[in-house]
Amino acid sequence: MTTTIDKNQWCGQFKRCNGCKLQSECMVKPEEMFPVMEDGKYVDKWAIRTTAMIARELGKQNNKAA
């Protein structure tokens, strides 16, 4: 299954977004370039970090709406 995300629509809603020019919090750090094996499972640290960032921003939006 493939999911396409319009980065301009999704990422652009966040104040810290720099338009995917790799200058934002989304930037891949060297130690996150490849998934690593932890406890017998592959872990994608960049995906975990950016998912947490997105969850945090969505939480802020929900708090403003409430």
UniProtKB/Swiss-Prot annotation:
InterPro entries noted in UniProt: Antirestriction_protein_Ral (IPR022759)
GO biological process terms on file: symbiont-mediated evasion of host restriction-modification system; symbiont-mediated suppression of host innate immune response
Pfam families: Ral
Keyword Zinc: no
rRNA-binding is among the record's keywords: no
Keyword line: Host-virus interaction, Inhibition of host innate immune response by virus, Restriction-modification system evasion by virus, Viral immunoevasion
Entry's family note: Belongs to the lambda phage ral family.
Protein role: Ral interferes with the cleavage of DNA by E.coli EcoK restriction-modification system, by modifying the activity of the host methylase. This modulation allows incoming, unmodified phages to escape the host's restriction system.
Protein name: Restriction inhibitor protein ral
Organism encoding this protein: Escherichia phage lambda
Gene behind this protein: ral
